[in-house]
Regions:
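Charged DNA-binding/catalytic regions of mobile-element recombinases
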Residues: 1-305
Length: 305
């Protein structure tokens, strides 16, 4: 309305226009005065202007996947004293929204009934008291212009940190094995304490080479059923985030190189920056570091005393 009056005031005058539109001349003049002197604007308007910049920054810095709750949590972590309802109001004004997860489970497992299956040591209890106590592994596929691309993950249950991953244009046993090798490289000395590796009954995870590598590393095997998302729920959950936050939002994909680069960036962000609700809205790396800090704290106190 103010813009309309600005456009026609030279021809008709402010008061005559206000006589036929739903705005008083005093309101118009006050708004124009605030444009010339921003300090005259209400405190809420000035605060909204400053917060709007930060809300949009957080949303964009986190790959445009955060909804109201996580944008609010991130702002609070950064020291902004802001209410969740305020963040929601500003995001609606900006037209910002978080990623919405679709169907969480897609069957990618090809089971081999002829291969003996190790016992299920997890029984759907995806909990761990320390890092390197329980790893879960799974894979998914991505449709590209050049055919399907496959992505394998190895995840530490304690912090939900992705410790190994690999992208390939072939659903071969080496795909899962390469992800495992990356995890073992990232976590040297895992055999120092008992570690269980849990997967579904996919042929990649029951292959002789994969089985031998686990045994060589001193890792105990656990296998759920085939095609049952609940038997590998944590891996399915992380893969669901990957598909929602990367694959569906940034496609279509040209080929394996594009998927690999995007996965590299997402895994780094997920491990170091993404807030996870089950961890108390802290990133996996921070949650894990807090565990190690607690383990060393008594020794530090003893030295000081």
């Amino acid at each position: 309305m103010v813009a309309f009056i600005d456009a026609h005031r030279e021809a008709y005058g402010v008061e005559p226009i206000c006589a036929v539109v739903p705005i008083a001349p005093s309101v118009y003049y006050e708004r124009k005065a605030r444009e010339r002197a921003p300090e005259r604007r209400p405190a809420r308007a000035r605060r909204d202007e400053a917060l709007t910049v930060e809300v949009e920054r957080v949303w964009r810095e986190h790959h445009a996947v955060y909804g109201v709750r996580k944008v609010w949590k991130q702002l609070r972590r950064e020291g902004y004293a802001v209410a969740r309802c305020t963040v929601g109001r500003l995001m609606r004004r900006l037209g910002l929204a978080g990623a919405v997860r679709g169907r969480a489970f897609t069957v990618t497992t090809v089971a081999d009934s002829a291969v003996a299956r190790p016992p299920d040591l997890v029984a759907r209890q995806f909990t761990a008291m320390r890092p390197n106590q329980l790893w879960v592994a799974d894979l998914t596929y991505v449709a590209t212009w050049r055919g399907f691309v496959y992505v394998a993950f190895v995840i530490d249950v304690f912090s939900r940190r992705i410790v190994g991953w690999r992208v390939s244009s072939s659903l071969r046993s080496d795909l899962a094995l390469d992800a495992l090798e990356q995890a073992l490289y990232a976590r040297p000395g895992v055999a120092a304490a008992p570690l269980v590796h849990h997967s579904d009954r996919g042929v990649q995870y029951l292959s002789i080479r994969y089985t031998e590598r686990l045994a060589e590393a001193g890792i105990e095997r656990s296998v759920g059923s085939a095609g049952d998302s609940y038997d590998n729920a944590m891996a399915e959950s992380v893969i669901g985030l990957f598909k929602t936050e990367v694959i569906r939002r940034r496609g279509p994909w040209r080929g394996v190189e594009d998927v690999e680069f995007a996965t590299l960036a997402w895994v780094a962000w997920y491990n170091d920056d993404r807030l996870l609700e089950p961890l108390g809205y802290v990133p996996p790396a921070e949650f894990e570091q807090a565990y190690y800090d607690r383990q060393t704290a008594p020794d530090s106190v003893a030295v000081l005393n």
